[in-house]
Amino acid sequence: MTDTTDDIAEEISFQSFEDDCKLLGSLFHDVLQREVGNPFMEKVERIRILAQSALNLRMAGIEDTANLLEKQLTSEISKMPLEEALTLARTFTHSLNLMGIADTHHRMHKVHNVTQLARSCDDIFSQLLQSGISPDELYKTVCKQEVEIVLTAHPTQINRRTLQYKHIRIAHLLEYNTRSDLSVEDRETLIEDLVREITSLWQTDELRRQKPTPVDEARAGLNIVEQSLWKAVPQYLRRVSNSLKKFTGKPLPLTCTPMKFGSWMGGDRDGNPNVTAKVTKEVSLLSRWMAIDLYIREVDSLRFELSTDRCSDRFSRLADKILEKDYDRGKSNFQKQQSSSCLPTQLPARAHLPACIDFGESRHTKFEIATTDYMPPNLQKQNEQDFSESDWEKIDNGSRSGLTSRGSFSSTSQLLLQRKLFEESQVGKTSFQKLLEPPPLKRAGSAPYRIVLGEVKEKLVKTRRLLELLIEGLPCEYDPKNSYETSDQLLEPLLLCYESLQSSGARVLADGRLADLIRRVSTFGMVLVKLDLRQEAARHSEALDAITTYLDMGTYSEWDEEKKLEFLTRELKGKRPLVPQCIKVGPDVKEVLDTFRVAAELGSESLGAYVISMASNASDVLAVELLQKDARLALTSEHGKPCPGGTLRVVPLFETVNDLRAAGPSIRKLLSIDWYREHIQKNHNGHQEVMVGYSDSGKDAGRFTAAWELYKAQENVVAACNEFGIKITLFHGRGGSIGRGGGPTYLAIQSQPPGSVMGSLRSTEQGEMVQAKFGIPQTAVRQLEVYTTAVLLATLKPPQPPREEKWRNLMEEISGISCQHYRSTVYENPEFLSYFHEATPQAELGFLNIGSRPTRRKSSSGIGHLRAIPWVFAWTQTRFVLPAWLGVGAGLKGVSEKGHADDLKEMYKEWPFFQSTLELIEMVLAKADIPMTKHYDEQLVSEKRRGLGTELRKELMTTEKYVLVISGHEKLLQDNKSLKKLIDSRLPYLNAMNMLQVEILKRLRRDEDNNKLRDALLITINGIAAGMRNTG
């Protein structure tokens, strides 16, 4: 399992970390004294001391006494009344979360206070130049870099969003506490604020009481963008630019975007029936609406800042032209709308603060379409006259959903009244309002930037209104003269402002808030994050089955691969739609076709890739290309104009071991088809994207075999693309945990096969890792920088391949033994499934309400149909973390005993891929706890199956032994003392939580309908996840 500290391996000051833990712990103790009373707090402290003492004795090797103390601890917990057990679970969960906050603060503090961090731009640029890379090559490679982080809604974020925000506020207060200039009064106020936040934490329900909808999940992802990435991106790009200027003499071009963002939230329908075509459209429109709203705020702040009247002649003519246009219409922009006056009558929030300290805090925590309660009497009468009773009935009956904080929509009638108010804002304006507004300008020279930006804001406001109409499903027409559709349209006036300021001697103004806004528009575009669509390959086959059967052509899925390719290629070359308008299909097929129709409506300006999960053949890709083409032709015919944007790039996702082995041949076959090769040359700049999945391959064959098969699959895909002169971008579907391909970003990228990272990369960030890596601007900047430098290094100085063919052969042998051992245990042992259900809280994880999708692909109790997340999640809870290491020990042992131990040691020292694979397994082993897994077995597992647990623990010890031998380490995490200390600091609370979970599981399995017991169990799951710093 990975802590979020892993990407920042520098030592942090543990004295100050411990001081913060003591401060938060002391304040929490005071809060609890008031909330639950002193007698109960004495019990809490006794349990903590018992757990700490047992841990200390075990670390000292005094096992017998440690066992006695743990038995006493178990006995005391078993005698606890349910209410006390529930309160104890809450207490230790909050304690672990507060320790996590202290850790987050110290990573932030380290980033601020170290002059040159390892893996920073300054560090890596310097290394590359010293290694012989020329400044020009370095500059060009950075400017051409294309990295995209894709945020997903995989259900691994266990904390409610409310609690996440409170945790961030506490981290910021700790940061403020480090200031040396605080007065006594300031510090007292700060402590009071901390007490308030901790009290609020305690009095807030930790559990989600209902499952989130896909729109809820999308809203959470967009909040990360608004609260953190919106601020982090300009800071990150400024850092890259400054480093480039320092080492190459040239800054990063203003519109250059080495980093972009995508999302699966609202687009990932693989196994999730709740993600429909309607949901995808709503989420995409929500994303656009929010982008425009953020830009309006930034333009407001910019208009306040750019009060200068010095500008270029060209810019002055533009401002004059805007004024003339307004006067030609008979009314000035500055009279028509308060929002477009030369100086806003009400300054934007935080406008008085410099951009460097604007943390981008939300001014709309709810995504609601704004309405007003006040309406002048004359407008009330006018609206009553304008709308007859029958009109109101039609509106009421036809009202749809638009966005509110609960995912519902405001009524159409409200929106129509709001539009009326917008259009007739002069009617009923009071004398006070007129007095408050500045007088209109008569000439552009007074404030040319405010005039131009005033028009920009007006167009943005109208664009937002158009989106509100689209959300409501009301008719509207896009007018390029009055609104924006593409980022290039918005960039044009902003770049003119920038050029004018530079040419008139105001470069310092140009390079401030304006440059930040230009970089935001270049990075986030008009949608903040482009939405990927994902669907399983079999669903497309079902759709084509329905079509070919209707057309009396046979059943598509029954054809062999060659016949499928012949049919698909022929239809793709044709110019007519394949799907008849009159066709009647079942609901599942209709949903697939509706999704392609929405994709055609939104186009590539709003959407990213179409990802095909469980892809295995070239026909899987062509099937999507055909359905996409057909939907676009049909929509073009209906509307009489081309669909917006271009076709979506189609990305096959290879997941299982067999599919990974077929990835290279599948891509080679695909690129050998003339139509397809010409299509990607023409529409996608000769670029093929291929996704590889880490979760299902790991569950299928074990982590070690999955890692090796992924490595080979990437080599084969790269080779196939090179044969046809096609550029390749690999899309890595990594989870947060090591069992699902997670791990430190830098380590992961640096261990890819040579040639697989050629300046471009896509990678998912899931669940709790999104919040951990990008939830705070300072940590987000650091993570973006790590992505940039890791990809840069892998591009210019690729990692070494295996030194000799013998190393590849040894990997094959280790992988074969490991896979056979893993599968014989997990899939072939008839007792394993029952052991899994008894020894872990897997069955109870479904009560958590942490995701909108089901935990299984199909209604079966088998492990094959269980998703990878609950599979990993369940083993993480018991501290067995089995998916990440099972089979590894057997493989290493088998090869070592054949006389290859020295070869394995050389591979560890010289082959980055092999080294990183073992290092990740070592991190997992450091979080595993053999005595705790034995405790779960003794208390929860039937006696006839306990022998299986014993065997698994022997395998765990074997794995640890051989990992240490091959790495040359005497103990786990020998080279990562920071992580070891952080793990050890959490163990007293974590051990007590595990014992409490075992007791609650015992009671719950005897009384399944007891909601209080269920709540207590879920809180222990939260607490253990906080202590392990991972879920699934």
Swiss-Prot record:
Its EC number is 4.1.1.31. Signal peptide: none annotated. Its cofactor is Mg(2+). Residues 398-407 have a biased composition (Polar residues). Its main location: cytoplasm. It is found in: Cytoplasm. Disulfide bonds: none annotated. The keyword Lyase applies. GO terms for cellular component: cytoplasm. It catalyses: oxaloacetate + phosphate = phosphoenolpyruvate + hydrogencarbonate. Residues 377-407 are annotated as: Disordered. Keywords: Carbon dioxide fixation, Cytoplasm, Lyase, Magnesium, Photosynthesis. The active site is at H154, K699. Through the carboxylation of phosphoenolpyruvate (PEP) it forms oxaloacetate, a four-carbon dicarboxylic acid source for the tricarboxylic acid cycle. Belongs to the PEPCase type 1 family. This is Phosphoenolpyruvate carboxylase 4.
